[in-house]
Design a protein with these regions (language model features):
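C-terminal ends and interior cores of transmembrane alpha-helices
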Residues: 108-127
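Intracellular juxtamembrane helix-capping segments at the cytosolic ends
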Residues: 146-159
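Single conserved hydrophobic/aromatic residue that forms the stacking wall/gate
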Residues: 196-205
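Helix-loop boundary and gating motifs at the non-cytosolic
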Residues: 12-80
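Glycine-rich segments within core transmembrane alpha-helices of 12-TM secondary carriers
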Residues: 168-190
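Loop-to-transmembrane helix entry/capping segments in MFS-fold secondary transporters
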Residues: 69, 161-172
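Cytoplasmic membrane-interface "Motif A"-like loop-to-helix N-cap segments
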Residues: 94-110
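Hydrophobic core of transmembrane alpha-helices in multi-pass small-molecule transporters
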Residues: 114, 128-147
């Protein structure tokens, strides 16, 4: 992998290795940020709020009464099952073919695109905003988990056997830092919006 980077970028092998390791770690930064803010902390609460505004405590989905928590669980399950079905094929590709980076890029773009499109939910009617968020989240989560197959397959190419633990630990550290910082930013934005909403004068009707 580092040889390919060196050839394509014109860098020395040592510089290419440092660049590849840095990219590997920064990817974990972004992946952990998604998992922390989108999967765990912010988006579930946003979906639940919008679902409550549109349907009340429960809504009739395909003839079944569901809560927001149930729908969120189904969304995660659909994404996980989708990746589980294709993971064996992805694993074969990752192990036997030198196209890991191509698939990693494609699936990362899918995940990043789905995440970006979450921001367009406020442009829709309140009754369909939560539906948009769920659909985009499923695509984003499929991209994240699918890309993870190829991301994990890159570690053996990042360095020698005695370097892999240090590289993996460094990537984890980047991930924790990135996830934590973005969560703080998002929580700060939520608190700021709450304060602005509270401070707005009540309009007489």
């Amino acid at each position: 992998m580092t040889d390919e980077v060196a050839i394509s970028s014109g860098l020395s092998e040592e510089e290419a290795k440092k660049r590849a390791v840095k990219g590997y770690c920064v990817y974990d930064w972004g992946k952990s940020s998604f998992e922390t803010s989108v999967v765990t902390a912010i988006l579930p609460a946003w979906v639940a709020y919008l679902f409550l505004e549109a349907n009340g405590l429960t809504g009739n989905i395909l003839g079944i009464e569901m809560t927001a928590d149930a729908i969120w669980s189904y969304a995660i399950t659909i994404a996980a099952l989708s990746v589980a079905i294709v993971s064996p094929s992805f694993g074969i590709i990752a192990d036997r073919r030198a196209i890991k980076m191509w698939w990693l890029k494609i699936l990362t773009w899918l995940g990043a695109g789905g995440t970006l499109l979450l921001a367009f939910a406020p442009l829709l009617p309140i009754s369909t905003q939560w539906v948009w968020l769920i659909v985009m989240f499923v695509f984003a989560n499929i991209g994240l988990n699918g890309a993870g197959v190829f991301y994990n397959a890159l570690l053996p190419h990042m360095g020698e056997d005695d370097e892999k633990d240090a590289i993996s630990n460094r990537a984890f550290a980047y991930g924790y830092l990135g996830g934590g910082l973005l969560l703080l930013v998002h929580l700060g934005m939520v608190m700021l919006l709450s304060l602005i909403h509270i401070s707005e004068p009540t309009r007489p009707y």
